[in-house]
């Protein structure tokens, strides 16, 4: 039977890992990893208020889930029987395989199922009377085609007007002094660029880099930027809250939880970051060892973040702590 503490652990993980589904978390490790999930959420810098709101929510018990599945299975056959019958296909129009009969029968538009038979004309009988020869009519005479194209070159009717002709221009020499002078390139000063418009010196080209990569987290002296300092301070507070908690045996529970995940899913997943941050080691998990967390009540105080770095802290959770909080939610958040 699950205790009230176990339900509280699941509710805390739901608010952290909303994108997870029940199939993402192994059910066998739910009880052992529960206290770590709750502790990770309570040590979050600004996430305890949501945990208080989730306490009033209730989960479906296994018996209620089984009854709901049975009701869905019973209602499925009824819905199938009440479905509309499939429409019947229209009867095919009879067709004849005989080419002669198909040519003699035609369909009358506007009448359904009515056909009209046209008698096939029979060839004329041979009576022995010679047939009269038909003389083709003489073709109509064709009119001559007039050719209106001029046969001679047009001449100048007015001798006083000169005939306009395109004068032949003399060829330009291949190289001229002007072309030679314009093709000469003017040397530019080294390190400067000339403007293509007025030829004024444009000065040195701007650099695309600003003290190295733009995404660097440190300045030239190796110090963290103001925003990174706030995130690092929050991460240190949350790590100390988790690793130094004394409400239960955090070291042993975390080690058993990590080994349980290793046995069930083959990988510790996000629990690896928790063990590495706190310098914990794994312990061989066995179902009998779940009695260690049977009556555990997690107590933790949310770290106070009132340092000067709080003014520049714009992230909800820093990088390492995000792995701790969300990773712990992935362990049990949706598996019950």
Curated annotation (Swiss-Prot):
Protein location: Secreted; Host nucleus
Q: Which residues form the signal peptide?
A: 1-19
UniProtKB keywords: Host nucleus, Secreted, Signal, Virulence
Q: What induces it?
A: Expression is induced by plant roots.
Disruption of the gene: reported phenotype: Decreases virulence in A.thaliana and G.hirsutum.
One GO MF term on file is: transcription regulator inhibitor activity
Q: Where is this region: Disordered?
A: 59-99, 189-230
Please give an example of a GO cellular component term from this record.
extracellular region
Superkingdom of this protein's organism: Eukaryota
Low complexity bias (residue ranges): 63-74
| Entry's Gene Ontology BP terms | effector-mediated suppression of host innate immune response
Is Signal one of the keywords UniProt gives this record?
yes
Its predominant location is secreted
According to the record's subunit comment, the protein's assembly and interactions are:
Interacts with A.thaliana CBP60G; the interaction is direct. Interacts with A.thaliana SARD1. Interacts with G.hirsutum CBP60B.
Query: Its biological function?
Result: Effector that binds transcription regulators in the host plant to suppress the host's innate immune response. Inhibits the host plant transcription regulators CBP60G and SARD1.
Stated name of the protein: Effector SCP41
Q: Which species is the source of this protein?
A: Verticillium dahliae (strain VdLs.17 / ATCC MYA-4575 / FGSC 10137) (Verticillium wilt)
Q: Which gene encodes it?
A: SCP41
